[in-house]
Amino acid sequence: MQAKAVLRHTPTSPRKMRIVAGLIRGKQVDQAKAILMNSTKAASRNVMQTLKSAVANYSQKNPDTRAGDNDLFIKEIFVDEGPTIKRMLPAPMGRAYRIRKRSNHLTIIVDTVNPVS
């Protein structure tokens, strides 16, 4: 049985978030938490929050199973592009430059390493 957690409208560019997501893709949850704790990327805090939420969703969805962090692994993790906010920056000679403030949606799906019966 798998569980999912989604973090929407994160004010980070999808490119930066995908770097962190690639670090933990396919890893066990305890290994992924260790990697995220030692990561210097700012996006790792958001990924850690969502990962903890996915694990909590799994335990809520399956109250009869006792799956710890070493029993779960990250089955899927992907980052989609969110809405882009456009701003104008004054430029020389009466012009204006467009600034695009990007956002993203993060989805994490966790599952058990060995199916528990």
From Swiss-Prot:
Signal peptide span: none
Keyword rRNA-binding: yes
Keyword Ribonucleoprotein (UniProt): yes
GO biological process terms, semicolon-separated: translation
GO molecular function terms noted in the UniProt entry: rRNA binding; structural constituent of ribosome
CDD domains per the UniProt record, alphabetical: Ribosomal_L22
Cellular component annotations (GO), alphabetically ordered: cytosolic large ribosomal subunit
Keywords tagged on the record: Ribonucleoprotein, Ribosomal protein, RNA-binding, rRNA-binding
A Pfam family this chain is assigned to: Ribosomal_L22
Family according to the record: Belongs to the universal ribosomal protein uL22 family.
Function: This protein binds specifically to 23S rRNA; its binding is stimulated by other ribosomal proteins, e.g. L4, L17, and L20. It is important during the early stages of 50S assembly. It makes multiple contacts with different domains of the 23S rRNA in the assembled 50S subunit and ribosome.
Binding partners and assembly: Part of the 50S ribosomal subunit.
Protein name: Large ribosomal subunit protein uL22
Organism: Chlorobium phaeobacteroides (strain BS1)
Underlying gene: rplV
